[in-house]
From Swiss-Prot:
It comes from Saccharomyces cerevisiae (strain ATCC 204508 / S288c) (Baker's yeast). This is WD repeat-containing protein YPL247C. It comes from the Eukaryota. Residues 1-64, 436-472 are annotated as: Disordered. WD repeats lie at residues 173-213, 241-281, 285-325, 392-432. The keyword rRNA-binding does not apply.
Amino acid sequence: MDPFHNGNKRSSISFGSSQRQPYNKNNYLSGTNGPSSAAQDQGRGPSPFGMSGNTTNGGNSKRNSGCDLSATYYASRSPMYSPLDFSPPVFSPNHSQLQQARGYAANIPVVSNLMNPSMASVCEYQSHYPLFGLDWSADDYVCLGSYKEDSRNKLQVLHSNDLLSWESVVDADVVYPVSKIQWVPSQLYPRKLATCSDSLRIWSVSPEERQFQEQINLSLCKYNRQHPANPAAADDMKVIGTFPPITSFDWNTVDTNLIISSSIDTTCIVWDLQSSHYVKTQLIAHDSEVFDVRFLTKSTQLFASCGGDGSVRVFDLRSLAHSTIIYEPPSSSVSGATAGTITPSSKGSDALLRLEPSPYDPNVLATFAADSNKIIILDMRNPESPILNLQGHGSSVNGIKWHPTKRNVLLSCGDDCQVLYWDLNSSFMEINAAGSKSPSIHGTSLEDPDGDTEMTDGGAGSGLNEDPLSLNNNSKQVCKTLETPNMMYANKTQEINNIAWRPQRGDWFGCVSGKKFQNVRVL
């Protein structure tokens, strides 16, 4: 969602303004006759964050009904993350959801569908609030974050013993909707999670004692360090509302004292929770807003970011004077921008919204752009050009997650009310057969046949060969497009805003749409 562009398209990932536009590609859930009716937000609506740090949520919106039945529609929007749209999904009036799914993808197994509950196991929890934020812990606690236009948002923790019913065990009030939630990796006790919105916060969670408390506001600590003569209190929203909002963050899985965050002010910050100053380093990462940042797999030194300039960049904390651009949009519109100058991404831009490094091959990353139904698979051994494009969604992609235990399996969700399951191993085998450097289909990188990842960051295996920022760009290859997923899950009523795998085994995934959280067994 883009907290800095007023707008009322609240589904998927934007605070941005919304316009209905023809989208010609067939999707699994819409017939050729188009939708029968729609209630789509067209006006300019409130934004949780003002450009100048205003914390008020003023604004009006209007609704228009009716649509042209000659085409399928999707909603265009500017980047970042905003979850909610209560308008009906784009379905043909003459076919059921399941029929349409089978009609457009007869060979795709349905993971589960609420119209036929016997096909698979689905459990749902109905919240009182529209939902966007989502993460699943190792001991089956799920944290949900609301998205409301006023200043009364919630964090809610659910728990289930059998994954067939969920109980709300504790919640906390927040002012602004969170754009990301993450439980601390590989740690059950004490339970902690982080969230980002106006600030980056660490929370302490004790369901047994019914306690959910903010432990530290890292953005506020940074501010008070810079203003020792006039520090701000934890509840001083007049000050906190002026901070550059945090668009995303990532908790390092090797050293959980390290967190990296991205912001709309073009910077990324590496935080050290053991340091008295908390800020380890801050750098200008892009020429415009930075929308996501992630540590590369098994590394404490290497990280990648994406942003409004449409590029993916790789950094090494040991040498921040240089970075490597591993992907740029085919026609870059930001070539004239100066580093450190904020260039807000415009509607229809190539802004990349989310980045997902593979948990098994640190050379491989997935990303997607604003207003796009395409997922881009990148390999740092073949920079600048994607190795694979996934175009199975019928509307804009909202989220992507690699499977936690299965190699080269990706989950995606979108405005077409679908979750798609992609097994990319066969596609990578075809790339391998073509003789290009490409992702491994086994347990290690292709350039590491003995199973040993090279050590490039002081003991943590990064999996990158030699200098990770000295990439070989000699072998160009034609990017393959994959349009048919292996499995799909169709939500009957609303766009799917976010997804998360059950981290232990990946036998279930969770998704949020509207006010509903669902967990679905993957057969």
